[in-house]
């Protein structure tokens, strides 16, 4: 079992029914509890069980036939616990590789993707490695792939390409080598890594405005995942389909939002990709408070679990949400996003928001931002807005924003108030009321009060 398949979380009810005494007597259960508590947002409990495992090992006979395997469980937790981030990992992985080579430990199989379409922010967020990605590729690629076994096949090349893509660099020249990796992954790798590779190709195609090819590739991979029984990948594959649908105005996004979106009543970190997809749907449908509630939980999670790239995406979506709510604090959140993005050199996480982000860029005072960094973000966002002009645009949004008075009058019309009643309630004269109603009808593209009421409900204006 490993967190990549979600098995620990799926079996949480079983583990929670066990007594502490029962768990303490089994090193596999101790390891499972440490990982489970980390995954369920209880890092202190996770560390408690990690220490219990260390104590268990100290009391073992080194000649015990199970000693190597149990030591491997400790190494597994040291590498894989989600809440520990990546600090020291670049040194730890080669050290574990040496232990494997000398047969000092035996590691359980582990996934680095958590079923997500990313290596940079799979089981851990590797943002700290991004500024020095090429150097790390040359120094630790081989030991990392050794430690991860099947899950390490192609990892170095995929991770480097994703890092370059996130920094806004052109990765089309790496397509040939990545395509060749597909066959190697099918032969020696895992469906999880194949998903990351497919997602990387999809994102590259979308960056170039090629939605048709991107959709075909994603649907082809989905069909293969179903055929091979890799159904654990489907929730995140469908979340990616939803994001693609949001870009090109397809119908799948509405289906996903109403039928497949996750329920965050119990917050589960491994659902983060789907949570941020749901947030985009909420923003599109003007459900801003629902979006902010979920974004607030994501912000807390990303801070506590050292996930800079997920935090950056969260801050950008908060900025868009607050901007659409006409709150001035969007600038504060966006400034934080720019500061964090510049630290790691991230560009694509901004530019992918295209038409949804462009109005913010046009109104933000960017004098404190490095000019070359700002130019990369602005130019890339303009290109994406050109490809996907309808992205996150509310359904049938009026071309001109309603004034505060027009919004008040629309609400009163929705309550079946007459012009006379509107004049009395708002203390305005009849000609003024008629002018506002006429302008309101023009903006809503309607010709009667009944049509105005329907438009108000459809647009979420009342």
Regions found by a protein language model. Give the residues of each.
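Alpha-helical repeat scaffolds
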Residues: 10-17, 44-55, 86-101, 130-144, ...
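Alpha-solenoid helical repeat architecture
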Residues: 25-28, 62-72, 103-120, 144-160, ...
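Extended alpha-helical scaffolding segments used for macromolecular assembly and cargo binding
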Residues: 1-29, 33
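Internal alpha-solenoid helical repeat scaffolds
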Residues: 22-196
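Helix-turn-helix DNA-binding segment
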Residues: 389-438, 442-447, 453-462
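Linker/hinge segments immediately adjacent to helix-turn-helix/homeobox DNA-binding domains
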Residues: 252-253, 271, 275-297, 303-308, ...
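Residue at a conserved register position within TPR or TPR-like alpha-solenoid repeats
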Residues: 2, 37, 82, 124-127, ...
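Structural motif corresponding to the intra-repeat A-B loop/turn of tetratricopeptide repeats
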Residues: 5, 40, 81-85, 167-168, ...
């Amino acid at each position: 079992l490993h967190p990549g398949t979600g098995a620990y979380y799926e079996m949480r009810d079983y583990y929670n029914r066990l007594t502490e005494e029962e768990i303490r007597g089994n090193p596999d259960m101790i390891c499972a509890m440490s990982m489970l508590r980390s995954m369920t947002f209880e890092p202190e409990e996770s560390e408690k069980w990690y220490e219990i495992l260390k104590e268990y090992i100290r009391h073992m006979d080194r000649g015990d036939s199970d000693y190597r395997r149990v030591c491997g469980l400790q190494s597994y937790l040291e590498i894989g616990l989600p809440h520990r981030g990546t600090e020291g990992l670049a040194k730890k992985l080669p050290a574990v590789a040496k232990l494997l080579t000398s047969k000092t430990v035996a590691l359980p199989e582990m996934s680095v993707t958590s079923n997500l379409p990313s290596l940079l922010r799979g089981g851990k967020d590797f943002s700290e490695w991004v500024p020095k990605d090429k150097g790390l590729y040359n120094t630790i690629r081989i030991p990392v792939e050794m430690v991860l076994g099947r899950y390490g096949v192609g990892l170095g090349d995929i991770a480097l390409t994703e890092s370059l893509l996130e920094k806004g660099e052109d990765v089309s020249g790496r397509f040939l080598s990545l395509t060749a990796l597909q066959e190697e992954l099918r032969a020696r790798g895992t469906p999880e890594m194949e998903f990351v590779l497919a997602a990387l190709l999809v994102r590259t195609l979308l960056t170039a405005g090629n939605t048709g090819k991107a959709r075909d590739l994603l649907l082809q991979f989905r069909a293969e995942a179903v055929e091979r029984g890799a159904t654990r990948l489907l929730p995140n594959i469908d979340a990616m389909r939803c994001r693609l649908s949001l870009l090109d105005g397809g119908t799948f996004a509405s289906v996903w939002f109403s039928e497949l979106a996750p329920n965050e009543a119990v917050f589960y970190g491994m659902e983060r990709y789907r949570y941020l997809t749901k947030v985009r749907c909420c923003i599109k449908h003007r459900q801003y408070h629902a979006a902010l509630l979920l974004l607030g939980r994501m912000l807390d999670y990303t801070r506590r679990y050292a996930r800079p790239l997920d935090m950056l995406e969260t801050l950008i979506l908060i900025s868009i949400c607050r901007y659409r709510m006409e709150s001035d604090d969007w600038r504060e959140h966006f400034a934080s996003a720019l500061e964090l993005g510049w630290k790691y050199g991230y560009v694509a996480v901004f530019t992918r928001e295209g038409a949804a982000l462009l109005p913010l860029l046009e109104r933000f005072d960017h004098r404190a931002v490095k000019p070359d960094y700002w130019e990369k973000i602005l130019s890339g966002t303009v290109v994406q807005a050109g490809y996907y002009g309808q992205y996150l645009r509310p359904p049938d949004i009026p071309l001109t924003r309603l004034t505060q008075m027009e919004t008040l009058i629309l609400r009163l019309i929705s309550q079946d108030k007459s012009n006379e009643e509107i004049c009395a309630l708002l203390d305005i004269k009849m000609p003024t009321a008629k002018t506002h109603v006429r302008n309101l009808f023009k903006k809503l593209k309607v010709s009667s009060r009944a049509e105005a009421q329907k438009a108000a409900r459809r647009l979420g204006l009342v």
